[in-house]
């Protein structure tokens, strides 16, 4: 479970509600008791519910029921029902709707990618990068995990990933073995992940025996060729495809023999359509 602190929950609310809801105040309806319900119009893989519930309870509202993150909702299915003071209901409405729409958009997009991949490779995986929209990293992470995806890198401090931009600063930027051996010495408990930008680099990297080799922006044919020769060069190395991988392009790589894909595409998926209904208690 991704943990969002109370300060982070407060920040999600404060973007919209710090001054209260003027319309509710002007109508003098804030004292009434009521209900709020959130519905997913088009259905799909759900996320953001646990965050939304924390936002609701922060406003002093009571959760009556809620679906679980990662569940598959039918079109029009209710995700959350909560009750409480009408002023708080109206304050939380849009901020919570935004969290649910963005989160569900991310999780459902990734869920569709995983379904496509696992039709071909039941053991296939998709890892999502740290290149999330600024300020959304934790929301993105909970959405990715809800859909069954992997977190590629939560940050740059806990994993090794050798890019060309690192190698540019080495005395010999083509010395893959030297770089990988140095990384193993100085980070002995970590897997060594490297990225290649060309087939020539990929072959040189494989000969240096990394744990994981990322192929960046390789064509399907190039990826297939590397996948065919990799077992003889580095039998224990896992291959991954990255760069331009999305729901549209993924199908072009399903015959190359690689089962791990790395992407940031879900973060930029269209938001889900969340319908919100607020009603006074007497009408329920």
UniProtKB/Swiss-Prot annotation:
EC number(s) of the enzyme?
Answer: 2.4.2.-
Listed A to Z, the keywords are: Glycosyltransferase, Transferase
Q: Which InterPro entries match?
A: Aldolase_TIM, ModD, NadC/ModD, Nicotinate_pribotase-like_C, Quinolinate_PRibosylTase_N_sf, Quinolinate_PRibosylTrfase_C, Quinolinate_PRibosylTrfase_N
GO molecular function terms noted in the UniProt entry? nicotinate-nucleotide diphosphorylase (carboxylating) activity
Keyword RNA-binding included in the entry's annotation: no
Which biological processes are named by the entry's GO terms? Answer: NAD biosynthetic process; quinolinate catabolic process
The family line of this record is: Belongs to the NadC/ModD family.
Q: What is this protein called?
A: Putative pyrophosphorylase ModD
Q: Which organism is it from?
A: Escherichia coli O157:H7
């Amino acid at each position: 479970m991704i943990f969002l602190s109370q300060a982070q929950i407060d920040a999600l609310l404060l973007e919209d509600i710090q001054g209260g809801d003027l319309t509710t105040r002007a109508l003098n309806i804030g004292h009434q008791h009521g209900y709020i319900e959130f519905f997913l119009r088009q259905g799909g893989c759900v996320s953001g519910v646990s965050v939304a519930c924390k936002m609701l309870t922060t406003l002093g509202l009571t959760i009556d029921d809620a679906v679980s993150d990662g569940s598959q909702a039918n079109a029009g299915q209710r995700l959350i029902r909560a009750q409480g003071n009408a002023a708080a209901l109206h304050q939380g409405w849009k901020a919570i709707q935004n969290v649910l729409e963005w989160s569900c958009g991310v999780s459902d997009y990734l869920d569709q990618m995983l379904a496509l991949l696992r039709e071909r490779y039941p053991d296939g995986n998709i890892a999502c990068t740290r290149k999330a929209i600024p300020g959304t990293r934790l929301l993105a992470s909970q959405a990715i995990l809800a859909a069954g995806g992997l977190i590629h890198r939560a940050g740059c401090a806990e994993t090794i990933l050798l890019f060309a931009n690192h190698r540019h600063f080495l005395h010999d930027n083509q010395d893959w073995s030297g770089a990988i051996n140095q990384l193993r010495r100085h980070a002995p408990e970590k897997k060594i992940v490297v990225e290649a930008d060309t087939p020539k680099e990929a072959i040189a990297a494989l000969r240096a025996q990394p744990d994981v080799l990322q192929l960046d922006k390789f064509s399907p044919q190039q990826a297939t060729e590397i996948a065919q020769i990799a077992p003889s060069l580095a039998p224990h190395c896992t291959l991954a495809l990255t760069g331009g991988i999305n729901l549209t392009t993924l199908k072009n790589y399903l015959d190359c023999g690689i089962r791990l894909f790395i992407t940031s595409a879900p973060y930029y998926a269209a938001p889900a359509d969340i319908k919100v209904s607020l009603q006074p208690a007497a009408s329920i």
